[in-house]
Amino acid sequence: LINGYSPFCETFFDNAIAQKEDLVGQINKGWTVGKRLLQHERSGMSSLVGAQSRDPGPSLVDVAIDSIGLGPDDKLAEAETRHSIIVHNMNNTAFALTRRRTVEEIDGGQTPGPATSIFKMYGTELQQEKSTLMCSIRGVQGYGWQDSSNFDADELEWTRAWLGNRAASIYSGTNEIQRNIIAKRVLGLPD
């Protein structure tokens, strides 16, 4: 509810009985099936599938120019904000290229494997960073809530996106869990 909506739910099945023919995988091996489902979900979370179909919204540069303006040298007037945007855009481009390579590997028949944890974790961190920068660049106007007389629809939407993106590091396995998976299954570190 932090952003005004409730996308999460928890369902409990008490005294549930499953028929033998409805069993997925082996008896008492549900976590193995569950991990594979989470892997698939994480690959979707990190935009491995349909990455180009999403509208990314306004660019940080456009919002910064509108909110802060350009200096006499035609550069963004605030050097610190300019640096933050450049670093974010470079990281986002590197992530997009790595994501594209992985999509090509999947198209070639490879299974993404535990690397999806890296995509999920880093993708959500980039998403959170962008929404934080977007609100920060707008100053006070970037943190509107319900007062439509002082905030336009875009400003209210970006505040909700910023708050909603806090959940991105929780769903599909928290980023802390992703770090553990990466340590064990990608880097081969001991328990």
Each language-model region and where it sits:
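Glycine-rich beta->alpha junctions and the first turn(s) of the following alpha-helix
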Residues: 1-96, 168, 184
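A general structural signal for short secondary-structure junctions and capping/turn motifs
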Residues: 1-4, 135, 160
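Glycine-rich phosphate/cofactor-binding loops in nucleotide/flavin-utilizing enzymes
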Residues: 28-50, 138-191
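Generic, well-ordered alpha-helical scaffold segments in large soluble proteins
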Residues: 37, 60-67, 101, 105, ...
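Short amphipathic alpha-helical interaction patches enriched in hydrophobic/aromatic residues
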Residues: 42, 68, 103-106, 110, ...
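Secondary-structure transition/capping motifs at alpha-helix termini
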Residues: 73-79, 108-110, 189
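Alpha-helical scaffold segments that form or flank carboxylate-/histidine-based iron centers
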Residues: 80-88, 113-122, 159
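C-terminal helix-coil-helix/basic helical segment that borders enzyme active sites and/or dimer interfaces
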Residues: 93-150
